[in-house]
Swiss-Prot record:
Self-association state and partner proteins as the record states: Part of the 50S ribosomal subunit.
Tree of life domain: Bacteria
Basic and acidic residues composition bias: residue spans: 227-238
Keyword NADP assigned: no
Stretches the record annotates as Disordered: 219-238
HAMAP family named in the record: Ribosomal_uL1_B
GO CC terms of this entry: large ribosomal subunit
Stated role: Binds directly to 23S rRNA. The L1 stalk is quite mobile in the ribosome, and is involved in E site tRNA release.
Full protein name: Large ribosomal subunit protein uL1
Source organism: Rhodococcus opacus (strain B4)
Family classification: Belongs to the universal ribosomal protein uL1 family.
GO biological process annotation, one example: translation
Metal-binding as UniProt keyword: no
């Protein structure tokens, strides 16, 4: 097990790990326990009661965070002609087709999201093994395979995030920065939680949201009441 820093251990002493905090309490405490001198990212981890090995229990989706992530995502677009021009006008960080594919094959991965027009997907498939494991492969289900590249770029730049359950039935996503107001962090959390609840597979049995923790990148995970899905801005325990 990795040795924890003194700053982390001091921060962890402020957390009662036997308690389930309200989302607002957790947001406040996450900011207080950040051991980073930078504007730390606030993250959420959710354990779901699903079996990701079963195709009908794969949970994935997208959500537009009302207050963004605090970071402007770097977006690339696979497109040609008029659609390429639209993507550039929308603010895409890189636009291309074969040239962009070759660049990625050469090891370039300095971007956070990839969009493709439908006609380019056959070509993009050649780098699926590179993009897929990193969660960067364009997919119609996440709105990243589309002819409306202007909207797709704007959505991602504006705070649209993707979530996908991993092999251990966990979801990880960002809800903002430590500099955000507590209420904005909670409202972002609420928007993501609503979408996760809507994505519940009909075949999932038992408790769906089993565990939730909120933390900054360098801080301890703060346990959140997984049953608290309404009145999230209330400070009191559920």
């Amino acid at each position: 097990m990795a040795k924890r820093s003194k700053a982390y251990l001091a921060a962890a002493e402020k957390v009662d790990f036997d308690k389930l905090y309200s989302p607002l309490q957790a947001a406040k405490l996450a900011k207080e326990t950040s051991s980073s001198k930078m504007d730390a990212t606030v993250e959420v981890a959710v354990r779901l009661g699903v079996d990701p090995r079963k195709a009908d229990q794969m949970v994935r989706g997208t959500v537009n965070l009302p207050h963004g992530t605090g970071k402007t995502a770097r977006v690339i677009v696979f497109a040609v002609g008029e659609k390429a021009a639209e993507a550039e006008a929308a603010g895409a960080d890189a636009v291309g087709a074969e040239d962009l594919i070759e660049r990625i094959q050469g090891g370039w991965l300095d971007f956070d999201a990839a969009i493709a027009t439908p006609d380019q997907m056959a070509k993009v498939g050649r780098i699926a093994r590179v993009l897929g494991p990193r969660g960067l492969m364009p997919n119609p289900k996440t709105g990243t395979v589309t002819a409306d590249v202007t909207k797709a770029v704007a959505d991602i730049k504006g705070g649209k995030i993707n979530f996908r359950v991993d092999k251990q039935a966990n979801l990880h996503f960002v809800i903002g920065k430590a500099s955000f107001d507590d209420a904005k962090l909670v409202e972002n959390y609420g928007a993501a939680l609503d979408e996760i609840l809507r994505a519940k597979p009909s075949s999932a049995k038992g408790r769906y949201v089993k565990k939730v923790t909120v933390s900054t990148t360098t801080g301890p995970g703060i346990p959140v009441d997984p049953n608290r899905t309404r009145n999230l801005l209330e400070d009191a325990d559920a």
